[in-house]
Amino acid sequence: MNKTQEAEEENVFTGDWYSDSAIMLEILDQITFYCGSDRKRMLYTKPGSGSMLYGTTWRGHLKYLPCGKQVLREKCPDTGLFKTKIYSEYPHLKGILKEYSNLYFPDFEWNQVQLNKDFPCPPHLDSDNVGESVLVAYGNYLDGNTCIYRNEKIEKHDARDKPLRFNGSKLLHWVQPIRSEGTRYSIVFFNNPYGLKKNNK
């Protein structure tokens, strides 16, 4: 049984930031990454990397088959919306993310999570997001900082050191490419209007 499956039965994290970062890195290594439809339009990534929404969506179908038939998404009983592909594939990850956020930013409520692997997103605004987001990064790499344009200055943050909280719907932000062999993961906790009921209740 891997750590993702264990989350349903017992706590995963220790309460020590760096130990828990190593645990989260191990968990993320067990996940198969790809790019969701919206992220494919933002940036090309090699197979095995990508950016995926873990949460709910109003889109009831995942894709169309060559025959024209729809592949339907699983319905989320908590919201009445539909689970994203990664949510259906890794349901136990929800408990892990809730435990982690309750440890390190318990005052922040969220209803969606973006999971990223080697995805140096270009400058953008998260126009659909509501309010602030919390970003945390993991991995052994050089550069790969999160850049935020604020007050006519560029801030560079290494989100491996502590959670980074900012309003991505109002502040232009992007990720520096890494310049060494290694893997950069990041998790972004946020809210959007499609989540309706909070996933962390």
Locate predicted features:
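Fe(II)/2-oxoglutarate oxygenase catalytic core
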Residues: 1-163, 169-201
